[in-house]
Amino acid sequence: MQRRDDSLLGSVDARTSLAGSNKMEILLFSIGTGERFGINVFKIKEVCRAMPLTRTPNMPRGVDGIVSLRGHVLPVLNLAKFMGVDASPESQRSMMVAEYSKHILGFLVHEVDRIIRVDWDRVRATDDMLTSKGGLVNALTELENGSLVSLMDVEQILVSAFGEDAVGEVERVEGGHELCVFYVDDSSVARKKIAEVLDKMGVKQMQANNGREAWDRLKVMAESAQAAGARLHDQIQAILVDAEMPEMDGYVLTQHIKSDARFEGIPVVMHSSLSSDANRAMGRRVGVDYYVPKFDGLALSATLRPLLAA
């Protein structure tokens, strides 16, 4: 597939209808081991045949080289090699071009299969079950035939390959010890980064690991505030949500928050690696107030600061 596989990816704009449906579309692929892997379609710009790469000195682990494609010079990661799988370079014959937090990169894989649509409540976090894959898989879902699909944790892959970006200097918020941000993300890398930003801002924080857990905790807090005759906004000044999460995604979580009067006045900020205009449109459809791409700590603090002062 040297050409762009538009027949496979179709129109991304049409997929904005998924907002609030608690569904996602997964592109299935293999790395030559018989296992099936998946990645969110929204992360993929195109699929093409693997092409000759240029090697540069001191390339990170798992990076086979760089390639020039449609005006972009992008690093190309060999997923089989990155995951410690003994596979010949020739067997990795397809390349998925992904956009992640405004960065574009290629993933070499053995074969790209098809796109499936799944409910987020059928996606389960792996916890520590897949330590053999170095934490590079963060969720599982089951196909109709009973076979499992491992969902790649792109955030962890990129941190493992390229390291973590420094958050930078973040000013403390006046009276921050009396302010609180509730955040939810299924990625341990993301939670660590968010916590670092909030710590530097000097504000209190509460967190959950997926949308379902977040909504359960938020409902309990809302019920407690209501019983006490208090406003929940006095306890939580902002809610930060990821887009992709097992069991309940950030779009459905936002819908729940925005349709519940007890959360009136609490802004919802979507903090996501899905940085395309289509994803922003999906967020707006369900009531997201602000959008911040991962992992720009300064942008995150700049977005939260006026919300905390309100």
Q: Language-model segments: which ranges?
A:
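An acidic, low-aromatic, low-complexity terminal/linker signal
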Residues: M1-A230, D234-I239, A243-V252, S259-P267, ...
